[in-house]
Amino acid sequence: MPTYNDDDDSSRPPSVHSERNQKPSSSQFLGVPSSNYNQRENSSRSGSSTISREPSSSGTMYPMASRDSMKESYDKNKGTPPDYTSYVSHSDAEPEQASSKSSTSIEDLLHTEYDDAPFAFSIPLLQRLQDPKNTSLLHAIHGLKGLCKGLKVDPSTGISTHEPHYADKLQMSDILNDDSNPKLVVHLDRIRSQDNNPEAKVSHDSDRVKYYGKNVLPEHDSKGLIRLMLEAFKDKVLILLSIAAVVSLALGLYQTFGQPPTLDPITGKPEPRVEWVEGVAIMAAIVIVVTVGGVNDWQKELQFKKLNAKVSNFDVQVLRDGAVHSTSVFDLVVGDVLFVEAGDVVPVDGVLIESNNLVLDESAMTGETDNIKKVDANTAIERTSPDVEYRKNADPYLISGTTILEGNGKLLVTAVGVNSFNGRTTMAMRTEGQATPLQLRLSRVADAIAKLGGAASALLFIVLLIEFLVRLKSNDSSSKNKGQEFLQILIVSVTLLVVAVPEGLPLAVTLALAFATNRMQKDNNLVRHLQACETMGTATNICSDKTGTLTQNRMTVVAGGFGTDVLFFDHNDETPTNVDQGSDSSKFEDAGASAFAFKRLSPELRDLTLYSIAVNSTCRQLFEDNSDTPRFIGSKTETALLDMSVKELGLTNVDSMRSSVDIKQFFSFSSDRKASGAIFEYKDKYYFVVKGMPERVLQQSTSVITNGSLDEVEDMHSHADYFKEMITGYAKRSLRTLGLCYRVFDSWPPKDIPTNDEDSSNPLKWEDAFTDMTFLGFFGIMDPIRPDVPLAVKVCQGAGVTVRMVTGDNIVTAKAIASQCGIYTEDGISMEGPEFRSLSDEKRLEILPKLDVLARSSPLDKQLLIEGLQKLGNVVAVTGDGTNDAPALKKANVGFSMGKSGTEVAKEASDIILMDDNFSSIVKAIAWGRTVNDAVKKFLQFQITVNITAVFLTIISAVASTDQSSVLTAVQLLWVNLIMDTLAALALATDPPTPEVLKRKPEKPGASLFTFDMWKMIICQSMYQLAVTLVLHFAGNSIFHYPSNTADMNTIVFNTFVWLQLFNEINNRRLDNKLNIFERINHNFLFIAIFVIVAGIQVIIVFFGGAAFSVKRIDGKGWAISIVFGVISIPLGALIRCVPNNFLRKVLPVKTIDTVFSWILNPRFRSKRRSTDHDVESLSLIPYEPTSPNEVIDSIRHSLGFVQRIRGGRIRHLLNNSKFDKQMEALPERLRPRVKQRFMKIRSPSVSSATSVALMIPISTLVSEASGRLGGHDIWISHNRQALDKKSSNVH
């Protein structure tokens, strides 16, 4: 047998992390004390009293705490998990050398002991069991027996939840000096079952938690409020405005305190010295803008942090105090006995106590595509010698983050949280998020508006500067006043740029998404990827599973039979067949079809049926308090059979029944087999029992029992048609049918069947064993449809969304249930998976529009269906709950996984988790998706209207003024900008869905953000607002008989402008031509609150703003003018909606404006006239649809480029990933694919996949093996879900 040198990676088999390429390197975690305990050398070693640390190859020494300091730290931190990261190696400065070799050998770890440590094993030693996999170390600690002894756990009963603070300390020598047999016998019959018990949690103060920690990662370092405010202040325009404000303040202070006062010509008294007020007011306004922006971002981060925590948490089954308990994955501790099964993503590191055909996909960790079959620790010890580090067929290790494909088992937890492999890797990969597609679309519009606004601001500055220079000779003012006038021109121009460049526009969608995802949780939609919320708004097709989604997943056996003549049905059910459906009901009556039919079964048949159901099942049982009746957890089909066994066959304890027989081999259910099986020894014979799809069971059965006895058997051939008729009759009644069969072997392994020499623990292959079976019986299982599904399907159809059923049931059952749900129509097509799969691409695309039901489908069929629908231009949402559904969930535009019945793999592959597994929740997701898109459009419509009015009003009034001053001052414009960018977004982005959103067809993918209805409202309202404000400014005094004092009228203009925006905000609550703009406004408290707050602040500004806001108190007539003109915008909006669009298309320059926007925001459009390339981006504001991740990055970079150059600030964070391309290009071409391959995405229980990641990582660590030396370069690694895609394709 091969051996592997610990110092030579080339001889080591593929492992979780090679010593040189892992990130972080194992040397950072090995050779460090597992907690703050004193450390000493085993007396059996050379006699030295302390361990000296080996220097790493880089020359750095690993930190070593003294005995006293560690003891003091431990005493001080009792009750708090130790901070292991404080002991991490300082070798990060030279990762290339530090990661090349472990600093602490296994021998050192085995002979290192810790005084006062309650457990024998340190965290570094437990990590070395699996990183890399090391069976020789398992031999050294005496296998599973030594491991359990060192962790103080009995695998038959689990840990105690009332674990004491251990007075007796366990040393490594106690384990190494134990010469007894390392094989540990686990007494499964000791396990009793118990329901979820809130008391079954390990205390945070226990030694186990203190020493090894909990299965929780530290919270992501979120940005604090001050940091977010500083980032908001990085806006280049705000910085420029701040500089101007400081200069203005300095000049104002000089004028106030350094110049003689100016006398009032009427009173002769000195005028108030307020020259400094404007500078202070501008700075105060900037502080308010920055503060509000920072608070807004801070609240958004808090919401997403809550979302991440909810996504990461799920329940697991553990063995504690001798009973099975359901607990949060966050409560797992080292020493727990964890139950795992197919579909789970392993949340911790551990060693297998028991394995029932466990097969894992470890590609996300090792990069190796082959699936790994696991064995328990005892078997691994038997198959290897102590000098062999690793053999592929003797692998008992489960690594956190890997996926269980088949089987089930029990796991002894050896590492949790930051000490597990997944935890260490995740902590090294935490990063910032990226922009969503809707943010990308908005950024393009923002860029166009920014260019127009920037041009307007520059034009204003140039015109005013020319006018200022022309008048300079005739200006008799002092040089200070001239400087103040010039500064006023600069301030007004810069402030106009603040208003005109919509920094808040690309970020407004984040607010809408944050609100929507938070509210969607209440509707049982847990959004994992933000873009899924947007995409659901354009969904045109839903491909839904049947079980649990359309049905209640509350399965009950209501009919069935044993052999040819013992039939039964539930008292509450109808007779099991229907004459009109072609079945012979008289045959049932003659056979005694009643619940008492079970009494006709012979004892032997009854026992065999019980063992067939109990042993060939992966369900676990729980007992409610003060109840002897078990409750089962697991597959709903299996729980239905077990419930029937309890009720009719006298089953009392499934665990006791399983432990009473010797299970030789177990075949877990798979989509290929459509069945599961088990071989067990019973009364000196070996029974092979199978349950599964009745067609498969009947096909492999050559005989059938009769008269309720195993002794009477007849040939199956003469009864085949009868059973097919029965199964068809059940299917027409929407019953799921299962068949049971068995076979008896006289010896084990059987002599007449070829054995599998490669795996002695599983000697038989399924295809060899599953032949020549005897048919036992069949069962009809009812799963009623959810009461609200037919209405939900009807609502989808009214919303232009086609619903299709994709199920593994037979076509008769599928059509029956689809008809009840309203999915299957008279002109619809139903088809089975194999037939659908065999069609040509052209034929498949031809029948897809009418395909309502796809039965007997495989994961491949579901993928083909999705691909075909997408080729036809559809946006497809799909549901899935199994591991094999992962590829389809990833392929769909939006993947929905089941929160209750779904596997962890399916949840990880999905975009949204249905917490209640209910189809109606998908309909709510569609409504929320459309509402998010509507919210962004509402905000866009509002902001562009304000932009147009503010820009033109400022330019016209400033140019027409004799002193180059605008009617709206800098402080007033900043107040308007605050209303426009933040408060309006809060108000308009938080409208809940209305029934109207599901009464219209979905938008086409890539549709323009602007509709004609939006354009006509923007143009008409802007024209009205400009007309009102300009007339008031230039003719208001004469029309309303005000004195020539401009202060009164300027205040009225400012007040009117703000009230126009406030009432137009109400107007913008609707995007269509319907008149009721107040619909469901009482459901949006935030909108009402913001309206009242803004109105209140405006009143305070006018009354008390004074010199700071350049306003003067106005009389009642002035207030009436302002508010009446504002209110008129509401009936005007109704009038605009009533005008036919065809008429306005001829009058309004919508096409010209749209073309100008498109020309500005996209160079592809400008080159369209001289290019015939069909791939060039569409006209108008329709976004370019990228086809690769690189195109996404390029598109984001291009779209936000102009805004970022002008503003910077928070926008800069959307462009971080652009560094990736540049720095990757700096690498040698031969290294690029290898660097990317080294860095793969994995799942962590504590970190949501809801955000994409991009992390600054020393590149020398990633490419040290490839190149040997690359200096100190750093790159941004932007990694996506490649690992999961790879994992999903492997599953398929």
UniProtKB/Swiss-Prot annotation:
Active site annotation, chain numbering: 545 (4-aspartylphosphate intermediate)
Membrane topology according to the record: Multi-pass membrane protein
Biased composition (Low complexity): 44-60
Disordered: annotated segments: 1-105
Reaction(s) catalysed (UniProt annotation): Ca(2+)(in) + ATP + H2O = Ca(2+)(out) + ADP + phosphate + H(+)
Covalent S-S links between cysteines: none
Domain of life: Eukaryota
Binding site for Ca(2+) 2: 947, 981
UniProt-listed Enzyme Commission number(s): 7.2.2.10
Keywords (A to Z) from UniProt: ATP-binding, Calcium, Calcium transport, Ion transport, Magnesium, Membrane, Metal-binding, Nucleotide-binding, Phosphoprotein, Translocase, Transmembrane, Transmembrane helix, Transport, Vacuole
Keyword Cell inner membrane carried by entry: no
Subcellular location: Vacuole membrane
UniProt-listed GO biological process terms: calcium ion transmembrane transport; intracellular calcium ion homeostasis
GO cellular component terms listed in the entry, alphabetical order: fungal-type vacuole membrane; intracellular membrane-bounded organelle; plasma membrane
Cross-referenced InterPro entries: ATPase_P-typ_cation-transptr_C, ATPase_P-typ_cation-transptr_N, ATPase_P-typ_cyto_dom_N, ATPase_P-typ_P_site, ATPase_P-typ_TM_dom_sf, ATPase_P-typ_transduc_dom_A_sf, HAD-like_sf, HAD_sf
Residues at which ATP binds: 547, 638, 691, 736, 807-809, 856, 862, 884
Alphabetical list of Pfam families matching this protein: Cation_ATPase, Cation_ATPase_C, Cation_ATPase_N, E1-E2_ATPase, Hydrolase
Transmembrane segments: 237-257, 274-294, 449-469, 489-509, 939-959, 967-987, 1017-1037, 1085-1105, 1116-1136
Record topology, Cytoplasmic segments: 1-236, 295-448, 510-938, 988-1016, 1106-1115
Main location as per UniProt: membrane
Biased composition (Basic and acidic residues): 68-78
Ranges of the Vacuolar topological domain: 258-273, 470-488, 960-966, 1038-1084, 1137-1292
Function: This magnesium-dependent enzyme catalyzes the hydrolysis of ATP coupled with the transport of calcium. Transports the calcium to the vacuole and participates in the control of the cytosolic free calcium.
Family: Belongs to the cation transport ATPase (P-type) (TC 3.A.3) family.
Protein name, per record: Calcium-transporting ATPase 2
Lineage, uppermost ranks: Eukaryota, Fungi, Dikarya, Ascomycota, Taphrinomycotina
